[in-house]
UniProtKB/Swiss-Prot annotation:
Localization in the cell: Secreted
Residues making up the signal peptide according to the UniProt record: 1-18
Domain of life (superkingdom): Eukaryota
Expression tissues: Specifically expressed in adult testis.
Protein name, as recorded: Putative testis-specific prion protein
Residues of this chain annotated as glycosylated in UniProt: N44
Additional notes on this entry: This putative protein is only present in primates and not in other mammals.
Keywords, comma-separated and alphabetical: Glycoprotein, Secreted, Signal
CC per GO annotation: extracellular region
């Protein structure tokens, strides 16, 4: 059985800008870049990030990375620090 998750948009920020934020974040490296970035999952719900079950976050790491790869491929250039990617992502299966 395949589970699908849809992320409506994602914010990609440099590590140094997120050290003080209370959010569910996942460090990884973007393609074509040697800089480490963090991906914060966003949705159209009103639930805060801290309300997400920990098991849900662990299960979605690969999907979050796939979303970041999708966004980075849409932008031919590497996102600059604090640039938000607000394009709607396509459904990604994991």
């Amino acid at each position: 059985m395949q589970h699908s998750l849809v992320f409506f948009f994602a914010v990609i920020l440099h590590l140094s800008h997120l050290l003080h934020l209370d959010a569910s974040i996942h460090p990884f490296r973007l393609p074509f870049s040697s800089k480490p970035f963090l991906l914060i999952p966003m949705s159209n719900t009103t639930l805060p990030h801290t309300a997400w079950p920990l098991s849900f976050l662990h299960q979605t790491v690969s999907t979050l990375k796939a979303v970041a790869v999708t966004h980075s491929l849409w932008h031919l250039q590497i996102p600059v620090d604090c640039q938000a990617c607000n394009r709607k992502s396509k459904k990604i299966y994991c």
